[in-house]
Amino acid sequence: MNTCTPNIKPSYDYNDLLASGRGELFGSEGPQLPAPSMLMMDRITKITDKEGLFEKGYIEAELDINQDLPFFGCHFIGDPVMPGCLGLDAMWQLVGFYLGWVGGKGKGRALGVGEVKFTGQILPTAKKVIYRINMKRVINRKLVMGLADGEVEVDGRIIYTATDLKVGLFQDTTSF
């Protein structure tokens, strides 16, 4: 674990995630999470640099589901479902958070994904979404980049999987 990075903990509550969105968690040069309503998690329940399927790091987060979440009112009227792209974005958000947690500096940007599979949906009647990210590699050169596999579970059932999630940290995003 990088002990030089401020606010390193094994878990984070909602207020911590909001602080990340304001640029307060990992310092002024560290990556930020988005603010609500694009923040796709309520808490990070576990983060470690040693565990996971590849023993390169693991992060787990949760989102409490309720019918008042903003996307249910418009996606779709009469047939509310959480957009699958928001679950994918949540996984990218967590890879970026991990890069800040291990000391990476820069502005986070999603760079791609190898493969995504959707085998279920998140409805307003669901209770809880769990995101799991297994880090495969962190490249720490001129560009800091994380590579990970992830999954999204709703109420005990895995409904999305993603391989080779890529997030980079950029010092300058003007030419990105």
UniProtKB/Swiss-Prot annotation:
Keywords: Cytoplasm, Fatty acid biosynthesis, Fatty acid metabolism, Isomerase, Lipid biosynthesis, Lipid metabolism, Lyase
Catalytic activity: a (3R)-hydroxyacyl-[ACP] = a (2E)-enoyl-[ACP] + H2O; (3R)-hydroxydecanoyl-[ACP] = (2E)-decenoyl-[ACP] + H2O; (2E)-decenoyl-[ACP] = (3Z)-decenoyl-[ACP]
Subcellular location: Cytoplasm
Keyword Cytoplasm: yes
GO biological process: unsaturated fatty acid biosynthetic process
Chief subcellular location: cytoplasm
GO molecular function (one): (3R)-hydroxyacyl-[acyl-carrier-protein] dehydratase activity
E.C. number(s) listed in UniProt: 4.2.1.59, 5.3.3.14
Subunit structure: Homodimer.
Protein name per the record: 3-hydroxydecanoyl-[acyl-carrier-protein] dehydratase
Organism, scientific name: Glaesserella parasuis serovar 5 (strain SH0165)
Gene name per UniProt: fabA
